[in-house]
């Protein structure tokens, strides 16, 4: 299959969280075009079954392939945990997740080999971060804590609200007591709560945001497979945004997260795929 090097990269998430990954791709791979899909009609993914998440991911990948993308980033930890292996086997296109990149960094930066992971119930319950970390260093102890209210709070725009601070304090208390020195933000929504989480955990805990490392991993993949954009045919605005619901609300969030104003977000019927 001949690949168009100047085709866009597809990025998808359950909602707005994957924009933190898209932002890092824009910063680190500025020549690459991006097609972003946020599944805002079905957010959050964290409380849904493996079979449901795989089904959602298949639909989204079919849509992104219709947009002629050359590679896909699953910018959602829950979908990476539950669906990545299945869709990599099923589709003839390079597909990256966000879990391994964060785990590798956490293993490098921890000093006392006690690593915390916060994420949705699905991500933490899957044990995937512990599995990856133990492969890198069997001596690492992994303490997981589901934080199911974080995604709805972020999607509501309450990133600095006193309610969010109170919820975060309750969730993170357990991790504070476990003497971790490294904390993986195991959901792409969570970097939007970084200041609140960092304030609660204190300077002694390193926060790992897998978004940056995922962008670098994508860059390596594109280089290895000779798929880097040549920069030819670059439009004035090389990014397209699609959602399954609430297009205007999504656009408002995107404008606060990305370094430019998103002029158009298109709602599509993802169930058709």
Can you annotate each of these PLM segments?
Residues 1-273:
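Non-catalytic structural scaffold of enzyme domains
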């Amino acid at each position: 299959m001949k690949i168009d090097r100047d085709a866009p990269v597809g990025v998808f998430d359950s909602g707005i969280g994957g924009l933190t990954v898209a932002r890092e791709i824009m910063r680190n791979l500025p020549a690459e075009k991006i097609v972003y899909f946020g599944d805002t009609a079905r957010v959050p993914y964290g409380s849904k079954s493996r079979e449901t998440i795989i089904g959602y991911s298949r639909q989204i990948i079919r849509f992104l392939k219709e947009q002629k993308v050359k590679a896909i980033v699953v910018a959602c930890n829950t979908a990476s945990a539950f669906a990545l292996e299945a869709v990599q086997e099923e589709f003839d296109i390079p597909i990256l997740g966000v879990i391994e990149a964060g785990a590798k960094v956490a293993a490098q930066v921890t000093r006392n080999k006690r690593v915390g992971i916060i994420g949705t119930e699905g991500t933490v319950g899957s044990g995937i971060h512990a599995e990856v970390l133990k492969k890198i260093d069997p001596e690492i102890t992994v303490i997981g804590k589901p934080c199911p209210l974080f995604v709805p709070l972020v999607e509501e725009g309450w990133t600095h609200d006193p309610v969010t601070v109170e919820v975060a304090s309750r969730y993170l208390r357990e991790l504070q007591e476990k003497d971790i020195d490294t904390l993986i933000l195991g959901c792409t929504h969570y970097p939007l709560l970084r200041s609140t989480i960092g304030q609660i955990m204190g300077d002694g805990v390193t926060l790992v945001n897998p978004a940056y490392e995922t962008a670098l991993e994508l860059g390596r993949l594109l280089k290895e497979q000779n798929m880097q954009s040549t920069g030819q045919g670059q439009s004035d605005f090389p990014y397209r945004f699609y959602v399954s619901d609430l297009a205007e609300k999504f656009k408002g969030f995107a404008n606060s997260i990305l370094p430019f104003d998103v002029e158009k977000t298109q709602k599509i019927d993802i169930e058709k795929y």
